Amino acid sequence: MSRYLGPRLRVIRRIGKLRGFTRKKPFRRVFKGFGGFKGKVIPPGQHGLTKLLKTRPYDSSESDYLIRLKVKQRLRFNYGITERQLVNYVRKAKKIKESTGQVLLQFLEMRLDNIVFRLNMAPTIPAARQLISHGHIRVNNKKVNIPSYMCKPKDVISVAMKQRSLQLVNKNLQEYYRRMRFYKKRLEKTLPFILLKIKPLGLTSVTAAVELITKGNVRVNNKSVKTPNYICRPRDTVSLRTKQGIKKVFLKNYLKG
């Protein structure tokens, strides 16, 4: 079955980020001028700025058809299926007496290539398709080389007991765990988690810390911060406005390096 082999960043810039499509991150241009267009993302292409300035600043120029088309294209590109495959999945979903959209997503999620991707055996769905088509994956101890194979509950997905197969999957898993460790360290330096570590503040959950930040009750280095994903540094000073007054905390004791 044919699949998309064209430029991927162009697709992502047009319809949004797709985790299963590629690991690449596009460069998004933002209009830095004044007026209603300030902060708007410039559409992709050579004449993207012209397209942006032709639209009304406070109104969406996307029609209902374009919105639905983008949703359909996101499904098609993310799961790596053709138009005909998607139509067949929709027809099958309509025959079941449940929510058609929910059943359609179940069909797409039960594909073998998607399950291999969800198990972090491959970084993307196209990479998972390659693992399957090269015979590295087993389903119930049987070789399956069809990426669109529909798995069932209680199926056992395993790796072929070959040196090359085990090397490929172990390499992908190690890369996944390395990224998770990096994200965990970065998450622990965000403002809500730092506020949760400070016992004198008396916060019991991350949700409570995020609520304080979004309300503007937290200042870092005498500057108001309303973004929960703010990365703190050891030299920062956090000021929290409470009913008892303003509490200042130096982050040297709560951050290492």
UniProtKB/Swiss-Prot annotation:
It is found in: Plastid, Chloroplast. GO terms for cellular component: chloroplast; small ribosomal subunit. Its main location: plastid. Changing Q73P: In CC-3008; suppresses streptomycin dependence of the S12 mutant P90L. The keyword rRNA-binding applies. Residues 110-170, 189-255 form the S4 RNA-binding domain. PROSITE patterns: RIBOSOMAL_S4 (PS00632), S4 (PS50889). GO terms for biological process: response to antibiotic; ribosomal small subunit biogenesis; translation. InterPro entries: Ribosomal_uS4, Ribosomal_uS4_bac-type, Ribosomal_uS4_CS, Ribosomal_uS4_N, S4_RNA-bd, S4_RNA-bd_sf. Keywords: Antibiotic resistance, Chloroplast, Plastid, Repeat, Ribonucleoprotein, Ribosomal protein, RNA-binding, rRNA-binding. GO terms for molecular function: rRNA binding; structural constituent of ribosome. It comes from the Eukaryota. Part of the 30S ribosomal subunit. Contacts protein S5. The interaction surface between S4 and S5 is involved in control of translational fidelity. One of the primary rRNA binding proteins, it binds directly to 16S rRNA where it nucleates assembly of the body of the 30S subunit. With S5 and S12 plays an important role in translational accuracy. Belongs to the universal ribosomal protein uS4 family. This is Small ribosomal subunit protein uS4c. It comes from Chlamydomonas reinhardtii (Chlamydomonas smithii).
